[in-house]
Amino acid sequence: MASQNSDINQLDDRVTLGITLMLGFCAVAPLLDVAAKLASPTIPVSQITTARFLLQGVIMLPICLWMRHPITIARPLLGLLALRGFFLILATYCFVAAIAVMPIADALAIVFVEPFILLVMGKWLFNEQVGRRRISASVIGFSGVLLVIQPSFSVFGLVALFPLGTALAFAFYMLVTRRLSRQMEPVPMQLHTATLATAMCLPVLLWGHLSDHPTLSPLLAPVMPQGIAWLWLLGVGIFASLSHMLITCALRFAPSATLAPMHYLEMVSAVGFGYLVFGDLPNLLTLTGVVIVVGSGLYIFHRERLTEVAQASGK
């Protein structure tokens, strides 16, 4: 009996540690967005995106070596890793382009449509069982996103749709990550994704530098950061690496079903940092949309949890 109680206490301690790390992620992740937004007035979005992956690779390499993970890429996994990097580039570029002109919390609220997209993609692409309740929750959640987009679209134009691009790209990124997570450790996966993403971004920057295209060259050509802009770029890389490490470690100690609903706490941090740094506060319509999105997302996680329990008890 004493041994059983000890095992239960150890399990509780691991879950508590996982929850603590997830709370750390929710606090740190918006700092990446803050650093990117601060850099965006003087640094092109493409350069901020590249800096994120370049610095993340530089930071993750010694961590990977210290943890004694292999740093070579297995050939069969190269294609999936490159695809993962590609979707993360798209997600990052769209989001940085959006928050360059939009409040961070507004953009993040739109991105939170991603679980609904992932749910629909799972049903259509992999024939996963998705009940009417979760489909209905997805539709309601998307209506909440429209409440956020509507005032943003009237103020910022087509840029307000960029977070939807982030959500779609991130949904594909998650599908690829699911496949890869069965075949490799998360820390080397982050290192290799950052390395391959950097390798894809650098030629684009070089083309922007050499090109004289009247529209694309100003968007893609790198510039020499001046003064404090160096600090913002460094912050992008540091906070990207730290947030990924926190969520990776959190998933090692606590089940994803426990941690997933907590992801919405990132919205609280985003609103707080957005107000403290930029003086941005969501209006009533945006807040209503956020509540609908978060509520629908939490309901979907609840239904998925019930489905998992039912499947486990039926075995």
Predicted features along the sequence, with ranges:
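C-terminal transmembrane-helix exit sites in multi-pass transporters
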Residues: 115-136, 268-287
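Membrane-interface helix-cap regions at the ends of transmembrane helices
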Residues: 7-9, 57-76, 145-155, 198-228
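Loop-to-transmembrane-helix transition segments
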Residues: 16-24, 64, 70-96, 158-164, ...
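Helix-helix packing/entry segments at the starts of transmembrane helices
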Residues: 51, 108-113, 180-196, 241-275
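Hydrophobic/small/kink-forming positions within alpha-helical transmembrane segments
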Residues: 26-31, 61, 85-93, 115-120, ...
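Transmembrane alpha-helical segments that form core, pore/gating elements
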Residues: 37, 45, 155-214, 218-224, ...
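Transmembrane alpha-helices of multi-pass small-molecule transport proteins
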Residues: 2, 17-20, 43-90, 169-176, ...
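Hydrophobic transmembrane alpha-helices of multi-pass small-molecule transport proteins
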Residues: 133-150, 285-304
